[in-house]
Amino acid sequence: MYDTIVIGAGQAGISVGYYLKKSKQKFIILDKSHEVGESWKNRYDSLVLFTSRMYSSLPGMQLEGDKHGLPSKNEIAAYLKKYVERFEIPIQLRTEVISVQKLKNYFLIKTNREEYQTKNLVMAAGPFHTPNIPSISRDVADHIHQLHSSQYKHSKQLAPGNVLVVGGGNSGAQIAVELSKERVTYLACSNKPVYFPLWIGKRSIFWWFDKLGVLHASHTSILGKFIQKKGDPIFGYELKHAIRQKKIILKQRVIAGKQNEMIFKDSSSLEVNNIIWATGFKNPLCWMKIEGVLDKEGRIIHHRGVSAVEGLYFIGLPWQHRRGSALLQGVGNDAEYIVKQMNGG
């Protein structure tokens, strides 16, 4: 019987592991990956974080290099691996969770390897886990090449011809800009993109966010509610410039697929050769057989990561407590809080 089991060995899970280690608990982290940092290594080749190194570290260990520079995805993958080794955080890799049940005062976790029992369970699968691909993708002809942004690595994966990137977030923007350098590129967004500079003066915009309290704004504060209502901006002006230069053609929200064509909100249509779905991720909780975890809309019920189900915790959710919760720098504060609550507050 473990004191705590953490499901997910990304930055959220190992941040919890850091504080569990300090509290002398008997714990283990389970992850289906073959190595720590695998999810970062598998993302598209050109990915660079828009948070500088000084805002891309976990508790207890700084990311090496120019603190004002932007780290690559491989740099983050290597950092996470080194972090686990330095703090000797116990992780069982190649372990996929099949089901989770609550039995009286403990959780029973069934995996592809064995069964585990634990008093506390932390769900750290994070926001970037299971691709969310709209059902209209099934209405598109088979010969049209489709990928989720998490599967995209480089342009050589695509078929000849144009590409439609669906999704107005930062990943969609970066991928569209990259592809626009070699082929006709369309970007479909629900809303008109809002752009923020990556740098103000010689400082990262996240330095200014930090000093102005934006990163620390809780989801219930006036500032936090305002930011959530506005949605996430596109960081940097590369997309804006590409649209102005007509290298990227902006389209409205996709509402339907019809064989070779995609239909948009303004009733226009477009014949496409490739589609990249930069449509985010969903929480993979279909195997959790516990009542009271989700509300009627399928959202996780929690307060700062503490579930109404005794002994159950969540970490790595967007706006779990504040604006910085889903960022590398911010997840440590949430991890410290839930371990503190686990130990009696």
UniProtKB/Swiss-Prot annotation:
Task: Choose one Gene Ontology CC annotation of this protein and give it.
Answer: plasma membrane
Annotated EC: 1.-.-.-
Q: Which GO biological process entries does UniProt record here?
A: cobalt ion transport; potassium ion transport; zinc ion transport
Q: InterPro entries annotated for this entry?
A: Auxin_biosynth/cation_transpt, FAD/NAD-bd_sf
Keyword set, alphabetical order: Cadmium, Cell membrane, Cobalt, Cobalt transport, Ion transport, Membrane, Oxidoreductase, Potassium, Potassium transport, Transport, Zinc, Zinc transport
Membrane topology value: Peripheral membrane protein
Return the Gene3D superfamilies for the record: FAD/NAD(P)-binding domain (3.50.50.60)
Q: What class of enzyme is it?
A: oxidoreductase
- Keyword Magnesium annotated: no
Q: Which PANTHER family match?
A: FLAVIN-BINDING MONOOXYGENASE-LIKE PROTEIN (AFU_ORTHOLOGUE AFUA_4G09220), FLAVIN-CONTAINING MONOOXYGENASE
Name under which the protein is recorded? Uncharacterized oxidoreductase CzcO
